[in-house]
Amino acid sequence: MSYSVQNIRNVCLLGHSGNGKTALAESLLYMTGAIDRMGRGADGNTVCDYDPEETKRQISISTAVAPLEYKGCRINVLDTPGAFDFAGEVIEALRAADAAIIVCSAKDGVSVGLEKAWKYCEERNMPRFIYISKTDEDNSDYNATFEALRARFGNKIAPLVVPIWDEGKKVTGIIDVLNKRAYEMQDQKRVEIEIPEGKDAVIEEFNNALKESVAETSEEFMDKFFGGEDFTYAEMIQGLRQGVRELSLFPVLCGSAVNCMGSLMLLDDIVDLLPNPMEGNYHKATRQDGETEPFVVSPGGVPTAFVFKTVSDQYGKYSFVKVLSGTLTPDLPMVNARTGVSEKLGRLYTMRGKKATEVKELGCGDIGAIGKMEKVKTGDTLCDARKVVALKELPFAEPCYSVAIVPKTRGQEDKIAQGLARMNEEDPTFSVTNNAETHQMVLNGSGDMQVDVLVSKLKSRFNVEADLKPVRVPYREKIRKTVQKQGRHKKQTGGSGQFGDVWIRFEPQTEQDDMIFAEEVFGGSVPKNFFPAVEKGLREACAHGPLAGYPVVNLKAVLYDGSYHPVDSYEIAFKTAAQLAYKAALPEANPVLLEPVGELKVTVPDSYMGDVIGDLNKRRGRVMGMDPTGDGNQVISAEVPMAEMGSYAIDLRSMTQSRGSFTFHFVRYEDCPPAAQEKAIAEAKALQAAEEK
């Protein structure tokens, strides 16, 4: 069934891990008849947590789409992970959604996940509800949670639903503040009850607060309010809807997903108060000439869709899209704005968890999936050839956690690379680099949990087991003293022999990293035709320094004397002689290890500044400055040796309760302090010994 854009709601569920987002989605599906039995995360049978990794870990690790129908509207629920390693999935869902429901637990109050979700919405000017979950569980405290929300986010927080307690402080029902009606659940069915004694005054207070919010949405309503006239129900809905859209009102609802308490009221408010796709996020598009323009969501426009997510598994590839203009149909030719290539659409589907239902079309504003679009990737814009525009790519955070990945069985490096490449189609937030210098395949991600999931999927989906090891630091070596040495190579094994003799002066230089080769030979002691062989031998030798085998930089080598044999001198002999001179000279040239140093920018709340700066000092970091961001955070700029950054992503998360974030980029090489140099040399020699076994 196709829905008009006015009757579509695209809503993402955000919040801290474990606060009940997936359970809420399950409850909404059940109450609308989309499923006939509610699953449980502990049983591994929910609609949205269908991946084997989610079942095993009992957490969400990817965004799932769960469409349902209610009161003539199609509601596309996007259930997102709360674990911060999978924030990329949240970024994808936010692009497809037109509004958010931030789920927080009555047991935990204002959590880090809630704060991050709120910030995501603020950055996008996204309308939002707050849903207080688990109100009926032991140790829950709705009042404390609500007051914490008010204290954190201000008086724009407005309750639409409040719980009812019995004498033992157990939640038994809820009250609809707008309609002043009370309900309880009996066998997962909503039953209206009388408003308990003593609640009337509180409900009246909240109801009047809603009326004040409505009055502020227009002059007409303001005049009516101060004139003492009551608003009709339709006017209340109109005003509340406008307040939600204009971000002057953030309704708070509550309930329990386990027994579906509050779920129908939430559905009512989704339909009545949240925007449809034409009223949702403002989009900017880049034309082919490079100019930007506002993108207007239009049912009658040329077909345009944004690919916000990709699923690629053993059953095939699905490109999840939000239709932003026109209507999509199978076999419709569309141009990929990124590549300029035209490709016919495959079959179209609506997805409910892992269940794909084929459809004949996807209308404007709707969310669905296209099958087998092999050249399409997450972040692409698919357009009609008459109007090719590119919407802004998804703003994924840079990977901040790196490990080396190696197969448990030798020879399976290609299998690991192929498996990671397939999974990178689904999860573009991680990257893989092959470091030619350290001979490591490096996996860069958001944190240890994401990396652990990737390794687990390599085994389950691609039948290859992998180990994780620390990333080796790419040190350099240089000399600090000028030394001159002879290199003499003579080999006689019968017949023609090999002879090469050179004197080379090795000295430090600061002009460039690469070796500078020069010659000061007089009188033909070394023929010019052997100069290239000498230079080649030296450049090859520079790949391994005298201290720990790291590349040598800032070196100047001057060939100034030598001798040759008219019969036995060949290029290979002079190449070998040059390398002998190098090996003899550099250990005497006061060599030193250079370590890579990077620029670190850490964003943390003010309250964690002392801990973070103290930790940077322990990592031999130099704090260069601190800048307030204006929202209670500070950006600390520092220079830190790369060797000290291996576990920083995990350590910062622990120090700041996941409130901190950082970027780190290489800047330059610096002399390594003696203690750090000794440690690096010992590690390099131990690694070399292990590889020789």
Please give the residue ranges for each predicted region:
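Structural and coupling elements of P-loop NTPases
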Residues: 1-693
